[in-house]
Curated annotation (Swiss-Prot):
The chain crosses the membrane at residues 33-53, 77-98, 113-133, 178-198, 226-246, 288-308, 320-340, 347-367. This is Cytochrome b. Its cofactor is heme b. GO terms for molecular function: metal ion binding; ubiquinol-cytochrome-c reductase activity.
């Protein structure tokens, strides 16, 4: 009798995805972040489920219900801070995962890459509507500012914003629908993750050398199951330290003040989730241009396969593009730091330069460097 995992229809799927999956023998720790993202998603769905059991999505009671979770529910404080800081860990893993994809040329796996972009956008949307739910000052004004970006769309903008709000300002209707969105989106993300994996397993994983690894594959289990387990342990260690020692390090003190439509906070800081994209919006003086840049700063990822002019896969043997890549990464860090600051004159100028560099590196410098490398190596 053959092993059940190879015959049973359900177990067979799991077997081909996590056990007998042929995997390149040389994938580095940068390939751990996919499984870490899966773990983050599971943590977020579980903690979110338990939070939803005690949360009320009504403007009069939302803030109090979060306080009640932290004070009166057994381990409610733990669940709440795991959920809040778990989201931050989710985005850190997400940005590293995308950065790995850019570095090693994984964007050439087109379907996987495009679904990944959709996943990134959906996760950002989920984080945004989730941030509104505690109904603190930052929640309320963040919702007001971000939804107002849509009013820049010509002709239909204002109508669209009021339609999303369900009134003439962010109010009861907005909070209730945002809770509904925040509840359903993670399940949509889970479905997309399955499609993402389905397409990945059509081609198999890329690897650091960028060469075809079909001649040298090893089974996923036990080699990568144990490696993923180590990654998960490290992730949980960082998350635990964050939750138990510095639960509010990534939060905003203003969110401990209940939402007040009559009083604006000193500056609405973008949440960690969207900081990179928000820099583009803040830097451009024109409202419509800023909104367009905000969207394009993420959608430019879709153009990465089109802009690829190199004859090699990945940057392992391409020092010029490597230097550009790390300048790009440092530039993103600068953009994130500048976006978090208040919008003073100095910050705006820095963010403008960072935004110009962001676009220029992707569209102009990287393809040009690839061509130079091709000619230097006589790859015609």
């Amino acid at each position: 009798m053959t092993i059940m995992r190879k015959k049973h229809p359900l177990l067979k799927m799991i077997n081909h995805s996590f056990i007998d999956l042929p995997t390149p023998s040389n994938i580095s720790s940068w390939w751990n972040f996919g499984s870490l993202l899966g773990v983050c998603l599971i943590i977020q769905i579980l903690t979110g489920l338990f939070l939803a059991m005690h949360y009320t999505s009504d403007t009069t009671t939302a803030f109090s219900s979060v306080a009640h979770i932290c004070r009166d529910v057994n381990y409610g404080w733990l669940i709440r801070y795991l959920h809040a800081n778990g989201a931050s860990m989710f985005f850190i893993c997400l940005f590293i995962h995308v950065g790995r994809g850019i570095y090693y040329g994984s964007y050439m796996l087109l379907e996987t890459w495009n679904i990944g972009i959709v996943l990134l956008l959906t996760t950002m949307a989920t984080a945004f509507v989730g941030y509104v739910l505690p109904w603190g000052q930052m929640s309320f004004w963040g919702a007001t500012v971000i939804t107002n970006l849509l009013s820049a769309i010509p002709y239909i903008g204002n109508t669209l914003v009021e339609w999303i709000w369900g009134g003439f300002s962010v109010d009861k209707a907005t909070l209730t629908r945002f809770f509904a969105f925040h509840f359903i989106l993670p399940f949509i993300i889970t479905a997309l993750v399955l499609v993402h994996l389905l397409f990945l397993h059509e081609t198999g994983s890329n690897n650091p050398s960028g060469l075809n690894s079909n001649s040298d594959k090893i089974p996923f289990h036990p080699y990568y199951t144990i490696k993923d387990l180590l990654g998960v342990l490290l992730l949980l260690m960082v998350l635990t330290i964050l939750v138990l020692f510095f639960p509010d390090a990534l939060g905003d003190p203003d969110n401990y003040t209940p939402a007040n439509p009559l009083n604006t906070p000193a500056h609405x800081x973008x949440x960690x989730x969207x900081x990179x994209x928000x820099x583009x919006x803040x830097x451009i003086p024109n409202k419509l241009g800023g909104v367009x840049a905000l969207x394009l700063s993420i959608l430019i990822l879709x153009x990465x396969p089109l802009l690829n002019s190199s004859k090699q896969h990945g940057l392992m043997y391409r020092p010029i593009t490597q230097v550009l890549y790390w300048i790009f990464x440092x530039n993103l860090x600068x953009x994130x730091x500048x976006x978090x600051x208040x919008x003073x004159x100095x910050x705006x100028x820095x963010x403008q330069i960072a935004s110009i560099c962001y676009x220029a590196i992707i569209i102009i410098f990287m393809p040009x460097a690839s061509m130079i490398e091709n000619s230097m190596l006589k790859l015609h």
